[in-house]
Swiss-Prot record:
Phylogenetic lineage: Bacteria, Pseudomonadati, Pseudomonadota, Gammaproteobacteria, Alteromonadales
Annotated Gene Ontology cellular component terms: cytosol
Protein's name in the database: Phosphoglucosamine mutase
EC top class, as a word: isomerase
EC numbers for this chain: 5.4.2.10
Keywords, sorted A to Z: Isomerase, Magnesium, Metal-binding, Phosphoprotein
GO terms classed as biological process: carbohydrate metabolic process; peptidoglycan biosynthetic process; UDP-N-acetylglucosamine biosynthetic process
Entry annotation: catalytic residues: S102 (phosphoserine intermediate)
UniProt cofactor(s): Mg(2+)
Positions bound to Mg(2+): S102, D241, D243, D245
Length: 445
């Protein structure tokens, strides 16, 4: 299959006003997507966004391009990525578009698509859109132009959907929960979901101003929520990222519960209820402790490439339901078609209620192995992983670790980063090895 030029592993993403993320490209992308999507279906597309200041200009540009191609546009405003997937399904739209750069800083933005069933757009359709981008932009005749309107009750619809994933015979009464919305797309949704289920909610990261998304809050910056859980004497904390498709949690001791541990909780709970279909899909970055804990329960475990797209592919291939990443993308195909931080949190809380257990008790059987991840930024077109210096450092570290650990080096699919991950049974040794390889990567840039 032909390689995609514009779409990456999670749509198009970059710094606003540079490279691909320009108003001109967004206009042309809307038109190109409209040309492809108008060939079949309802000729109706949903557009949602996170809280970045640049979301307004990309929303307008996409809307204009889609309308020029003859598609009607439903605007839902700031809305979590999984909410757009859900609304795309329920409105029977031809596609959903999300304007977001997820966990990236505010000066980045991105555009990604969902198909009519709420899943990521197929590679083949993305290639068709890219082919249309090479053509000159034209406009349909005036009477065929698309219309645009705003959906005022989109947030309420999604709140009810989220609550519907919690057992009807249970409540969250008696629980004090800190909810960190990362100043992102869940700011007007997540606190309502958990409070309406009965919890006492302390919201942080719920005051977006266009430039503070993910800044020292959210699932990629856990210091604030850990402090707040301890200061408030809360039972737990739930941290979401800027577009709401990731979750990290915090127990009452202020300790972080990551995506691997959440996967263990969900898989173990599903097995207890006889509802686990097959096994669990993690990624190359998943902690070895998850693998070992699932082995103890006789639950099969497979690793995909990094990225929720690849986790989804492996789940579908094996007809399994639960998978995800240690970064907090959690997929449960019985409860949605994409990673959903709010729903994943609800499923963990449901497990706590069913088993009358705390978050610490649910995760206690899983012992995390020391794992160090270092992100090394690079510039230029050369791949530092091709450097002989890096290859030599990796080889020597792997020989030192032997069967007691592993090394993973990978180039990020969304940022100019090399991710250096080292795992083993001795934290100090793992840290030293990771720093050694990271230094080699910097020299190899």
């Amino acid at each position: 299959m032909k390689q995609r030029q514009f779409f990456g592993t999670d749509g198009i993403r970059g710094k606003v006003g540079a490279g691909k993320m320009t108003p001109e490209l967004a206009l042309k992308l809307g038109w190109a997507a409209g040309r492809v999507l108008s060939r079949t279906g309802t000729k109706k597309v949903i557009i949602g966004k996170d809280t970045r200041i640049s979301g307004y200009l990309f929303e307008s540009a996409l809307e204009a391009g889609l309308s020029a191609a003859g598609l009607n546009v439903l605007l839902v405003g700031p809305m979590p990525t999984p909410a757009v997937a859900y609304l795309t399904r329920t409105f029977r739209a031809e596609a959903g578009i999300v304007i977001s750069a997820s966990h990236n800083p505010y000066y980045d933005n991105g555009i990604k698509f969902f198909s009519t069933d709420g899943s990521k757009l197929d590679d083949a359709i993305e290639l068709e859109i890219e082919a249309e981008l090479e053509k000159p932009l034209t406009c349909v005749e005036s009477h065929l132009l698309g219309k645009a309107k705003r959906i005022d009750d989109a947030a309420g619809r999604y709140i009810e959907y989220c609550k519907g994933n919690f057992p009807a015979d249970q409540t969250l009464e008696g629980l004090k929960i800190v909810v960190d919305c990362a100043h992102g797309a869940t700011y007007h949704i997540a606190p309502s979901v958990f409070s309406e289920l009965g919890a006492e909610v302390i919201a942080i990261g719920d005051k977006p101003n266009g430039t503070n998304i993910n800044h020292e809050v959210g699932a990629t910056s856990m210091g604030k929520i850990c402090e707040t859980v301890l200061a408030e004497g809360a039972d737990l904390g739930i941290a979401l990222d800027g577009d709401g498709d990731r979750i990290m949690m915090v127990n009452r001791k202020g300790e972080v519960i990551d995506g691997d541990q959440i996967l263990y909780i969900l898989a173990a709970d599903a097995q207890k209820r006889g509802q686990l279909k097959g096994g669990v899909v993690g990624t190359l970055m998943s902690n070895l402790g998850l693998d070992l804990a699932l082995q103890a329960l006789d639950i099969p475990f497979l690793r995909s490439n990094v990225g929720d797209r690849y986790v989804m592919e492996m789940l579908k291939k094996n007809d399994w339901r639960i998978g995800g990443e240690n970064s907090g993308h959690i997929l449960d195909l019985d409860h949605g078609t994409t990673g959903d931080g709010i729903v994943a949190g609800i499923l963990v809380l449901a497990a706590m209620r069913r088993q009358n257990a705390t978050l610490e008790q649910l995760v206690e059987p899983m012992k995390m192995l020391p794992q160090v991840l270092i992100n090394v930024r690079f510039e230029g077109s050369n791949n530092p992983l091709d450097s002989d210096l890096v290859k030599s450092a990796q080889r020597e570290v792997e020989q030192s670790l032997g069967a007691r650990g592993r090394v993973l080096l990978r180039k990020s699919g969304t940022e100019p980063l090399i991710r250096v991950m080292v795992e083993g049974d001795d934290h100090d040794l793992v840290l030293a090895h990771a720093n050694r390889i990271a230094a080699a990567v910097k020299l190899g840039c």
